[in-house]
Amino acid sequence: YKRQHRMLAELQPTAIRGNYSEIHALLANAGTGTGVDAVVDAAHPALSVDALARGMQDYLRTLSFPMILVASGREDIVASRDALCFVKNGSPRMSRVTGTGCMATEVLAAFLAVATEEEAAFRAAVFATAFMGIAGEIAEEMAPRGSGSYHIALIDALSTITAEEVAGRISLGETKTVEN
């Protein structure tokens, strides 16, 4: 825990993105003790997403610098210490294709590269997450069968998606600002 905390304090990344289990491991390793083990409770998926989101914010509040956490899964979660957003875009097929997590991280990095302040970085993370999910939805429409054709369609969708498509398809769940 102390080594992880020290490394993060030294590097001060703008964001960390991972799937639910990777973010859960980060939180569990941090010893936040916020009950995020509910994440693995398949019987209560909504509770699990909420528990992970709460755990993410609790963890971020322990840091001495601003950072964003993005967790991808059934419903993507974007969290900062004082804001939380659930992104509902995406396709279940994304989890069955190797490399989509890496693609999502690259999209996030590109969006964050143009964000100049903490609030803008949070919005950039939300839109990057939605953008990747929308590309996954478009790919599913383009390649209704097979993971190989889906992977190619996803790359095609990422390179041809328009601002109008994003605006017409974006699906955000509850977005809230939390006072410290």
Task: Please report, for each region that a protein language model flagged, where it lies by residue.
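Charged C-terminal helix
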Residues: I134-N180
